[in-house]
Amino acid sequence: MKQHIGYLGMGIWGFCLASLLANKGYPVVAWSRNPDLIKQLQEERRHPLAPNVVISPNLSFTTDMKEAIHNAFMIVEGVTSAGIRPVAEQLKQITDLSVPFVITSKGIEQNTGLLLSEIMLEVLGDSVTPYLGYLSGPSIAKEVLNGSPCSVVVSAYDSQTLKQIHEAFSLPTFRVYPNTDIKGAALGGALKNVIAIACGIAEGLSFGNNAKAGLVTRGLHEMRKLAAIMDCKPETLNGLAGLGDLCVTCFSESSRNLRFGHLLAQGLTFEQAKAKIGMVVEGAYTALSAYQVAKHHKIDMPITTGIYRVLYENLDLKEGIALLLQRNTKEEFL
């Protein structure tokens, strides 16, 4: 009998959602490949990135993925975007996926340009399509842990899977809106991190709110342009998984991508800023992936390209800004 939810990944976002499910009453078995972290969680019942949060007795921990997913009625992942493929490959060795699998990470794979749901399909095969789901939207982990109101989107290919995921995550303070556009939700969640780095740079250089508003608006336009090429629904990018997530990531002081931009503006290098943040900055890696995809499809994405060049071609920040400001203006929605 399937009795619990298996959770893969125990970073702050993974811990946040695993705690939400456990506090709702579901038994949750959470996995991490980090034995030191698992030992600390088991012994101290506190997460190092959220030390004030008491861990629910419904939440247990393991370094054995098989233990986490065996007899689970649902599996949720919260690893880094770069960790999705290794997780999928490990899953392939130990199970035939036949329960809802919820992706909560955000990113685009480098070199392949694949969204995270597409990686799962490539590794596990098309037979898992009915079981795949995706959760995205404006959801700062610490606010969710504090019980602050939050609205997100859950997407799935299969209506029954969508219903199961919706029911599992829904709470009065964690409102879940159903959606069938997995690719659109995944793309919005990935690209907004790149725009947030640009906003962090603008803030760090004291450009003001007018500049940030322009970056957010034109950034959304870039997201929609790429979404159109990838057969996503434009309304998805206008909703919680697109505009909503973009806004919170570009304006919240808790946003690590925004803070990463601040550090770049202070003169730190890519590696120095990354070390200072101390956690994965997904936008720094998505900038490369998104640039590769845009170049392949011959799509003009100047903000994304600018961040890519700053991070990977050592373009001077001021020169990059000058290039953006000197671009010819054209009709707004072209």
From Swiss-Prot:
Positions of NADPH binding: 13, 33, 106, 141, 256, 280, 282
Subcellular localization(s) per the UniProt record: Cytoplasm
Superkingdom classification of source: Bacteria
Pathway named in the protein's UniProt entry: Membrane lipid metabolism; glycerophospholipid metabolism
GO (cellular component) term, any one: cytosol
Biological-process GO terms, alphabetical: carbohydrate metabolic process; glycerol-3-phosphate biosynthetic process; glycerol-3-phosphate catabolic process; glycerophospholipid metabolic process; phospholipid biosynthetic process
Amino-acid positions noted as binding sn-glycerol 3-phosphate in the UniProt annotation, renumbered to this chain: 106, 137, 139, 192, 245, 255-257
Function: Catalyzes the reduction of the glycolytic intermediate dihydroxyacetone phosphate (DHAP) to sn-glycerol 3-phosphate (G3P), the key precursor for phospholipid synthesis.
HAMAP family found in the cross-reference section: NAD_Glyc3P_dehydrog (MF_00394)
Protein's recorded name: Glycerol-3-phosphate dehydrogenase [NAD(P)+]
Record organism: Chlamydia pneumoniae (Chlamydophila pneumoniae)
Gene of this entry: gpsA
